[in-house]
Amino acid sequence: MAGFPGKEAGPPGGWRKCQEDESPENERHENFYAEIDDFAPSVLTPTGSDSGAGEEDDDGLYQVPTHWPPLMAPTGLSGERVPCRTQAAVTSNTGNSPGSRHTSCPFTLPRGAQPPAPAHQKPTAPTPKPRSRECGPSKTPDPFSWFRKTSCTEGGADSTSRSFMYQKGFEEGLAGLGLDDKSDCESEDESNFRRPSSHSALKQKNGGKGKPSGLFEHLAAHGREFSKLSKHAAQLKRLSGSVMNVLNLDDAQDTRQAKAQRKESTRVPIVTHLTNHVPVIKPACSLFLEGAPGVGKTTMLNHLKAVFGDLTIVVPEPMRYWTHVYENAIKAMHKNVTRARHGREDTSAEVLACQMKFTTPFRVLASRKRSLLVTESGARSVAPLDCWILHDRHLLSASVVFPLMLLRSQLLSYSDFIQVLATFTADPGDTIVWMKLNVEENMRRLKKRGRKHESGLDAGYLKSVNDAYHAVYCAWLLTQYFAPEDIVKVCAGLTTITTVCHQSHTPIIRSGVAEKLYKNSIFSVLKEVIQPFRADAVLLEVCLAFTRTLAYLQFVLVDLSEFQDDLPGCWTEIYMQALKNPAIRSQFFDWAGLSKVISDFERGNRD
């Protein structure tokens, strides 16, 4: 094929040859026809009498239009494209005779092309034509239809037509790339706009001398590579889906509720804990409501939260952690209690696992709350305008009260009881509000609440829980009168509580009262537990740590039988006891930080 610049024979009529100069205009023309060269046939038979003798005449391909840019050919009302560069078109556009050498063009121009104007006329901008009604409101004209096989192309839709050859080669190249002419995922109109234009890349690869055969080779070579990659990607996708299906062992995760929860934007609690905030220091008194199931602790907390608003922080019972995180510990515990499988090691192991899970939220929250305590400000007596931190249960119930009840019921062994007891911790300022209620009324409220896992509980269970609270309360009274070391000596059998009373220089209570408290307290049970190994230092240290920690607490007793459906009256009793007891003190907390921590616990409990 002859090179583009340097053609000697000038074209007739409105056509002119391209001069070899460095002008920007000719450079632009050169770039344009270099791009056309990518799609033009390698051999073009010249027509007419102006073809040079003895040389390959490609003037029909390399003629430069007088005006720039070449415009798109108009279309008919039916959307069909009119023939481009036919004998009539060349005659009307360039003024050439039918015998002119420029009677045809091997390619069709895109939509909107117009014939070049004569040399003496100034180029004018094309006038946009309104879209034809036949196209429809949802159909868009195909901008690449000039690259397709059409019935308007010279030569018809046969295998010898150059336009048909280009279209066929392009479709083969797309098939090599894994792209069909009409994808299953898109409509025909959408597929027209997704056809890649590869002539620029082909031009750069061939040094500006792209050929049709190079286009097909380029598409075929890369098509094989892309088809392999797409095949491998599809295999990996199917494999990953199979692995995920195998790992998805819990069918409950695919329920509608689980999917809705995954879509919701949730905040990770530890992020809010570490977020910087402006500390707001406030004095607050910590109260922990305790009692048997169904006495009305949650009802009281909801009432106080509605009354005091921002002056209170209510910490709910971590029921969701106990029932929805891993196994349901509440259900497992009541199952062991109702089956009455006493004195078995496997039952004790299951009960121990449940009790250790019950203690976890209380220990975590106590540690977090301790970090927000302003120790520099110290503690003070409770004032009327102080804030309140109200908890639904203390660690005391999970690590001391209920394990003691299970030990007496022979559902927990001595060894497992010591393990749970060793987890008990408390801070100075923690006040236990023991809400007492007679068994009959308590049973009525428990049935009214109607929790499924509590349906097997009876009056005997509630009585044993109340007895366990009473034993812990009697032990706490002893810690207020005697030193922890003396109490441990009594538990180890080194002395008696009566001897300790007589040896005291200033006896506070009589020995008979002390002996009665000791027999009804948890210390009498501890003496029985550690008696076989009373010389073991670990057991003695567990007892000593428990006695010292128990002395940190303060107790407030409320008999709910006197306040039947009287929540304000019940709170008044609690409030007055807190004001009158000088040992119950308020501490200073970072109120803003504590509010964020508790809000995260409440959010997790609601979900």
Swiss-Prot record:
Primary residence: virion
Localization terms from the record: Virion tegument; Host nucleus
Family, per entry: Belongs to the herpesviridae thymidine kinase family.
Binding site for substrate: 355, 451
GO terms of biological process kind: DNA biosynthetic process; TMP biosynthetic process
Organism, as annotated: Epstein-Barr virus (strain AG876) (HHV-4)
Record-given protein name: Thymidine kinase
Cross-referenced Gene3D superfamilies: P-loop containing nucleotide triphosphate hydrolases
Taxonomic path: Viruses, Duplodnaviria, Heunggongvirae, Peploviricota, Herviviricetes
Positions of the UniProt region annotated as Disordered: 1-160, 180-215
Miscellaneous remark of the record: Phosphorylates and thereby activates certain drugs like acyclovir (ACV), valacyclovir, and famciclovir to a toxic form, that leads to successful suppression of the infection, while the uninfected cell does not have this ability because it lacks TK.
Active site per the UniProt annotation: 317
